[in-house]
Amino acid sequence: MKAQLRALIGQGIEALRANGTLPADTLPPDFVVERPKTREHGDFATNAAMLLAKAARSNPRALAQALLAALPASDDVARVEIAGPGFINFHLTPAAYQREVIHVIKQGHDYGRGLAGNGRSVGVEYVSANPTGPLHVGHGRAAAIGDSLARVLDANGWNVKREFYYNDAGVQIENLALSVQARAQGLTPDSAGWPENGYRGDYIADVAKAYLAGDTVDLEGHLVTGTKDPADLESIRRFAVAYLRNEQNHDLAAFRVDFDIYFLESSLYKDGKVDEAVQKLIASGHTYEEGGALWLKSTDFGDDKDRVMRKSDGTYTYFVPDVAYHLTKWQRGYERAITELGADHHGSLTRVRAGLQAMELGIPQGWPEYVLHQMVTVMRGGEEVKLSKRAGSYVTLRDLIEETSADAVRWFLIARKPDSQLTFDIDLARAQSNDNPVFYVQYAHARVCSVLRQAQEKGLKYDQTHGMAELARLDDEHSLALMLELSRYAEVVELAGQTLEPYQIAQYLRELAHAFHTWYHNSKVLVDDAAERDAKLTLAVATQQVLANGLELLGVSAPEKM
């Protein structure tokens, strides 16, 4: 609908150029067509006249009047009026919204999908948890946001690759191996001789038990078997990493999160990518040596201080493999790279970008893009839940899914802006009431399915083609309000892709569900008149389709019964 109005406005601008109101060489401005904050100001508004006023040497309201007069007639527009300093407000006809219902029915699963990405490549990295323990609720928020963002970008026409980066080469992996070894040797976290920075959760005992039993882990087709030798630290390291990666994959599968690429930090060293990145930086002239260390002149690229790349002992600082990793993304042809991280990692953003810019490879400023999420507080019975016995120090994603459901966890972890603190209320997530937003939205979908079953049980034939032809019968307040909400869906999907904010889909679905429940309570659907009944069922089915499409973008199921 917005595209149709933009086309009308464009034709009006051409008419003003043709009649001399605008100079012939006036370029069409980048005007907006948007929904006003209040319905009293119409269904859509544009600022086109305000942007063109200078070129026309006219005040904006006078030019708005001229543009209004030059607009072609449209069956979708009931009236047009000027407001404020020169906004043009459009009031649409009921037929415009009724036709949108037909678009939903005909396009089905594809309704709301766009072409903004035009098949261009984007890599979306998310979760990227260290393989040192179970996924916690923070990883869950990263998974929910990142996976939904990938779905939204796909719906906007981007060629999306989903990527998980494993930090499998750092000190934490050494601490993991030592912890499992200690358990395998019969020690407990309270024993003398327990590693100073060891992991204390019960899961360490599970890993040690599996290792000593000679279990085999199938990690994406690669088999890793415990050698049963508690003295073989390298074998313990390999087995523990494989075991915990497999556990994380199990949790992610239960959470409906998939990846196309699993990238290992260790491969950067094995394949020489870290050395390659360092040599490119040295060759660019943006490094220097001081105190036996190699430094990057990162202050030349917006950092608050220069950064050590290679310490005097010859080892690299942690941000160097991060730069090398993102260099591989550029080399793999990603036009855009988006990384979803916890807000506690914000300090690394400037350093990684500085390292990439310093290579002088033509990498755009602001590449990669980042989406940062804040912490999650878990509540039960009005009190904060802080610990999991299995993990030892945090609430795991598996705990939340088992206590509520994958649907509820995904919804609640997505439904607020990523940069806002989030409270996950277990009691609310389990509630089967309208106060629970995921229940409220899913129930709207299930309610349509129930109505269709009732029609079938009563022997009432539903003719969808007839229903689409009879939509003009539905011109009451609640029907039109529901149609208006349906017409917003494609705009919300596009906006969520532009802003990298899938939470907007969740907000929209609540509003759509509210419009549907209001319509349902004020409109008997299975009436005796076949034409009216078919029209109402068609509106209900269109709502069902949009709810299903939107829930799919969030990775939440659309149940037929509740």
From Swiss-Prot:
PANTHER family for the chain: ARGININE--TRNA LIGASE, CYTOPLASMIC, ARGINYL-TRNA SYNTHETASE
Pfam family, one: Arg_tRNA_synt_N
Keyword Nucleotide-binding: yes
Catalysed conversion reaction: tRNA(Arg) + L-arginine + ATP = L-arginyl-tRNA(Arg) + AMP + diphosphate
Protein's GO biological process: arginyl-tRNA aminoacylation
'HIGH' region, short sequence motif: residues: 129-139
Superkingdom to which the source organism belongs: Bacteria
Subunit architecture: Monomer.
GO cellular component, as recorded: cytoplasm
Gene3D superfamilies: Arginyl tRNA synthetase N-terminal domain, HUPs, Isoleucyl-tRNA Synthetase, Domain 1
UniProt cross-references to HAMAP family, sorted A to Z: Arg_tRNA_synth (MF_00123)
GO molecular function annotations of the record: arginine-tRNA ligase activity; ATP binding
Family: Belongs to the class-I aminoacyl-tRNA synthetase family.
Compartments it resides in: Cytoplasm
InterPro entries listed in its UniProt record: aa-tRNA-synth_I_CS, Arg-tRNA-ligase, Arg-tRNA-synth_N, Arg-tRNA-synth_N_sf, ArgRS_core, DALR_anticod-bd, Rossmann-like_a/b/a_fold, tRNAsynth_Ia_anticodon-bd
Annotated keywords: Aminoacyl-tRNA synthetase, ATP-binding, Cytoplasm, Ligase, Nucleotide-binding, Protein biosynthesis
The protein's name in its UniProt record: Arginine--tRNA ligase
Top enzyme category: ligase
Sequence intervals crossing the membrane: none
